[in-house]
């Protein structure tokens, strides 16, 4: 990789050397696209958008369960360690790439066109996730509307969707307290409401025969996409204002649920169950892997959302400070959500007379079965149910804004002349296409397809993308050069901590996660349903497709160059001639070349087009590159 970094230092820079064959058309490089691309209207827009993107549904329904099953309070030790080793450095790397270049996940690979396939893989992953994520928002909308009643519909048995196994677990009292119930032989009204009414899963014969479309879910999904479209209609200028509400209001609701939860009888029992340290769990590698997975997915690294949001920043936005605010805020929110969830579960376990571990679940089972059942035990249950699902709605929408903005930005940056003036129309077409592709999720067996997408769309493929990104930036482009870019942007170079993580610790951690996910692979399942072999194969191919986009992109990049294979690799790995800050005023240092007698420095590629070749002695960029190479040689000695 070092040879690839230094290959371009051996020749004087000429237009033919800097331009790929596809770049050699008659293009006016003086055109400035930064102004009409748009920016955040304020620094707080970006910060709240990042908080809303990271603080999502997983903070409520995954972290608390993961914590209590992996050592309780002891889980926080590997959690914060993995945050420091993997989460914060990768978060900062992705923000730095986006802000420095003002480009989306595809165009940002001007940094090294050889790896543009990683950007395409990001888009595939985020597209698949956006399809099923909005279905979860549709479920939330369904429950939100169902909460607008005097009595919650999942509170009692006796409805047409209930079976003879339905039992209202009210905790029958004995003289000394609560009689324990055998929950394994009965089904709660909330569980039958979810599976038999909302999903109507009994109408499906499996993933291969999903049954009919549920019109109520179909309408909820349509409403979810309409909301998303309206919020991203004007890009970050509209979504940046919506997040002032959607990123902050969940904290108010979470605080209300927390206060209500801790005042319930039995709440302390649930909190103890959640946070009592069990340090012997730290001896298990599984706990450390689970902590790393939680960090990796909760921060949204590798989906392109962080890169996209940062690309709309001004060049000198302090993303170093923002990185710590968002990542630590995300961690604290997860812990607080655990208190709100387990305080209510403790109350529920006391009312039912069963241990907390019999009522605690993760994922949709917590959001759509257990917590709704707990709400029925509270006074003013529709009010608390509405608040809970409204919180989930706002948490989900923030993340969905990022997913859609990532796709729209990536494609419009690739075709700015055609799509940027019609960005709103293009956004609408994307929403319509994804709504149509998501209709299979509204069928009786739609949950099976949702589980398949959730298990495979962003699994090992996402890890491969992030590892590739990390290595391409730090090893091929060069850690010294990348740190100089950050210095130009922020006024300081990242220290030893970030360099060590980018070069060694973060890739090693991700590689361990990748190996673990492959070795510990388990077939998908939903309840007692086991997926057929063809569905498992489809899921694996889904994950492999994103991985295969990386070598496919390399092949395309190499074929576009000329010369021998090694020369093509050198040229394809070299930064594109127009790589750098988008605004001419920010092109300083290695991105400016001053000709003898010139009164005003111009961007390097403008000089190359107007004045021809520049020898290495007159080229500031090449002098800086040589200085970088010398520093790297000294560090190796």
Curated annotation (Swiss-Prot):
Parts of the chain on the Cytoplasmic side: 1-45, 557-637
Membrane topology type: Multi-pass membrane protein
Catalytic activity, reaction form: L-proline(out) + chloride(out) + 2 Na(+)(out) = L-proline(in) + chloride(in) + 2 Na(+)(in); L-pipecolate(out) + chloride(out) + 2 Na(+)(out) = L-pipecolate(in) + chloride(in) + 2 Na(+)(in)
Record field: transmembrane: 46-66, 74-93, 117-137, 215-233, 242-259, 295-312, 324-345, 378-397, 425-443, 459-479, 500-519, 538-556
BP terms from Gene Ontology: neurotransmitter transport; proline transmembrane transport; proline transport; protein catabolic process
Entry-linked InterPro entries: Na/ntran_symport (IPR000175), SNS_sf (IPR037272)
Modified residues (Phosphothreonine): 20, 588
Keyword match Zinc: no
Name this polypeptide is given: Sodium-dependent proline transporter
């Amino acid at each position: 990789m070092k040879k690839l970094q230094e290959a371009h230092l051996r020749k004087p820079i000429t237009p033919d050397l800097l331009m790929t064959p596809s770049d050699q058309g008659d293009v006016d490089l003086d055109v400035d696209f930064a102004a009409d691309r748009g920016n955040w209207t304020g620094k707080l827009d970006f910060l709240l958008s990042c908080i809303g993107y990271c603080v999502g549904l997983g903070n409520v329904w995954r972290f608390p369960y993961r914590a209590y099953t992996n050592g309780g309070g002891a889980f926080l030790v590997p959690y914060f360690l993995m945050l420091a080793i993997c989460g914060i450095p990768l978060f900062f790397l992705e923000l730095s790439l986006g802000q420095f270049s003002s480009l989306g996940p595809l165009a940002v690979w001007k940094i090294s066109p050889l790896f543009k396939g990683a950007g395409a893989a990001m888009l595939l992953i985020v597209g698949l996730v956006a399809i099923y994520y909005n279905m979860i928002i549709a479920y939330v909308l369904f429950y939100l509307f169902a909460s607008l009643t005097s009595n919650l519909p999942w509170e009692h048995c006796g409805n047409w969707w209930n079976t003879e196994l339905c039992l209202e677990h009210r905790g029958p009292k004995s003289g000394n307290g609560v009689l324990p119930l055998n929950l394994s032989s009965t089904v709660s009204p909330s569980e039958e409401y979810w599976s038999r009414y909302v999903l109507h899963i009994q109408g499906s014969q499996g993933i291969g025969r999903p049954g009919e479309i549920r019109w109520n879910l179909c309408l909820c999904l349509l409403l979810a996409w309409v909301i998303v479209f309206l919020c991203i209609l004007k890009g970050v200028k509209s979504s940046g204002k919506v997040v002032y509400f959607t990123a902050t209001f969940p904290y108010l609701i979470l605080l209300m649920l927390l206060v209500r939860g801790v005042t319930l009888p039995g709440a302390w029992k649930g909190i103890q169950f959640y946070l009592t340290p069990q340090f012997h769990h730290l001896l298990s590698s599984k706990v450390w892997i689970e902590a790393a997975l939680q960090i990796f997915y909760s921060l949204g690294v590798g989906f392109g959302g962080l890169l996209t949001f940062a690309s709309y920043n001004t060049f000198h936005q302090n993303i170093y400070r923002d990185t710590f605010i968002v990542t630590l805020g995300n961690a604290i929110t997860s812990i607080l959500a655990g208190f709100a969830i387990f305080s209510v579960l403790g109350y529920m376990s006391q009312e039912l007379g069963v241990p907390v571990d019999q009522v605690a679940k993760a994922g949709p089972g917590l959001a759509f079965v257990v917590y709704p059942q707990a709400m029925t035990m509270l006074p003013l249950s529709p009010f608390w149910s509405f608040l809970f699902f409204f919180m989930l709605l706002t948490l989900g929408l923030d993340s969905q804004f990022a997913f859609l903005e990532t796709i729209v930005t990536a494609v419009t940056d690739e075709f700015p002349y055609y799509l940027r003036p019609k960005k709103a129309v293009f956004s609408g077409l994307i929403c319509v296409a994804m709504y149509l592709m998501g209709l299979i999720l509204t069928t009786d067996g739609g949950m099976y397809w949702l589980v398949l997408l959730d298990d495979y769309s962003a699994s090992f493929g996402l890890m491969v993308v992030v590892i590739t990104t990390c290595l391409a930036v730090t090893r091929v482009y060069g850690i010294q050069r990348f740190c100089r870019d950050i210095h130009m942007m922020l006024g300081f170079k990242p220290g030893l901590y970030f360099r060590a993580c980018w070069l060694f610790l973060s890739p090693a951690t991700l590689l361990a996660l990748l190996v673990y996910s492959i070795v510990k692979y388990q077939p998908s399942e939903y309840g007692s349903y086991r997926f057929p072999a063809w569905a498992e194969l489809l899921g694996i191919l889904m994950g492999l497709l994103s991985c295969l986009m990386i070598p496919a992109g390399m092949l395309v990049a190499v074929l576009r160059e000329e010369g021998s294979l090694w020369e093509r690799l050198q040229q394809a790995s070299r930064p594109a001639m127009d790589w750098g800050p988008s605004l001419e005023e920010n092109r300083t240092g290695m991105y400016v070349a001053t000709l003898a007698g010139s009164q005003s420095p111009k961007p390097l590629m403008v000089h190359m087009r107007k004045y021809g070749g520049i020898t290495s002695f007159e080229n500031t960029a090449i002098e800086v590159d040589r200085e970088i190479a010398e520093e790297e040689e000294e560090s190796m000695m």
